[in-house]
């Protein structure tokens, strides 16, 4: 969906996308810890592969995005990670465009950053069910917000794209549901086997080893 081809978006929208993406990448690279480079590479590669299976919808396409999951794990580093994935898709497979790369990155990265913030808020509860449910919501919102941003990009680029903009949003409803389940499951697994991959903003790790069961069988931390 975020793979809008060249020649579709108007120049003012292109310029805005380029400026904001460059700023986001610069900040993301500044935040990148060398220790996290392998993790970043794996998620960027996962994003690259997931989006290769796609179906055309008007001037864009329908496919998995995983930007909610990427945002949860990487935070600001998600911006350069998504940019690299999109660039390789455009160069190797002609999926999307080069000139429009800034807009495509913006449409995916902004929801990813919002999902990261939402997930960090949920972690203050220290309750696994709330955290996992929030992760699922982030999977849904990551796709939904990207659909809205893509539709907005098309709408600001000409009235002829108005109908396509509406179609983009509705066509991704199944993807939203799929990514809800996938993201929740992925975060639940990470919390159990590798919680250090999900550090809080204060650098503290959430461990669920001390989850206990109360008399009613309900889990609490």
Model-predicted segments: where are they?
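Hydrophobic cores of alpha-helical transmembrane segments in multi-pass inner/ER membrane proteins
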Residues: 15-21, 109-118, 177-189
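Interfacial aromatic-anchored transmembrane helix boundaries in multi-pass membrane proteins
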Residues: 52-61, 84-115
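Small-polar-interrupted transmembrane alpha-helices in polytopic inner-membrane proteins
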Residues: 44-48, 78-91
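Hydrophobic transmembrane alpha-helices
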Residues: 1-69
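Short helix-perturbing small/polar motifs within transmembrane alpha-helices
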Residues: 105-150
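Cytoplasmic-side transmembrane-helix entry/capping segments in multi-pass membrane proteins
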Residues: 35-44, 65-69, 102-109, 130-137
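Alpha-helix C-terminal capping segments
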Residues: 70-77
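C-terminal transmembrane helix-loop-helix hairpin of multi-pass membrane proteins
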Residues: 134-143, 157, 161-221
């Amino acid at each position: 969906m975020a793979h809008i081809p060249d020649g579709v978006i108007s120049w003012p929208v292109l310029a805005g996308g380029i400026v904001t993406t460059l700023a986001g990448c610069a900040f993301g690279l500044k935040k990148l810890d060398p220790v996290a480079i392998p993790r970043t590479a794996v998620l960027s590669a996962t994003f690259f592969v997931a989006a290769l299976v796609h179906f055309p919808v008007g001037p864009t396409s329908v496919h998995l995005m995983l930007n909610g999951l990427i945002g949860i794990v990487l935070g600001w580093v998600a911006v350069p990670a998504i940019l690299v994935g999109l660039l390789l898709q455009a160069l190797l497979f002609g999926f999307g465009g080069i000139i429009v790369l800034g807009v495509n990155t913006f449409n995916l990265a902004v929801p990813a950053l919002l999902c990261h913030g939402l997930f960090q808020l949920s972690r203050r509860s220290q309750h696994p069910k709330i955290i996992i449910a929030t992760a699922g919501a982030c999977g849904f919102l990551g796709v939904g917000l990207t659909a809205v941003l893509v539709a907005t990009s098309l709408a600001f680029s000409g009235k002829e794209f108005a109908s396509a903009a509406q179609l983009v949003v509705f066509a991704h409803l199944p993807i939203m549901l799929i990514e809800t389940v996938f993201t929740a499951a992925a975060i639940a697994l990470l919390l159990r086997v590798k919680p250090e991959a999900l550090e809080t903003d204060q650098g503290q790790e959430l461990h669920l080893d001390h989850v206990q069961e109360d008399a009613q069988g309900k889990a609490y931390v």
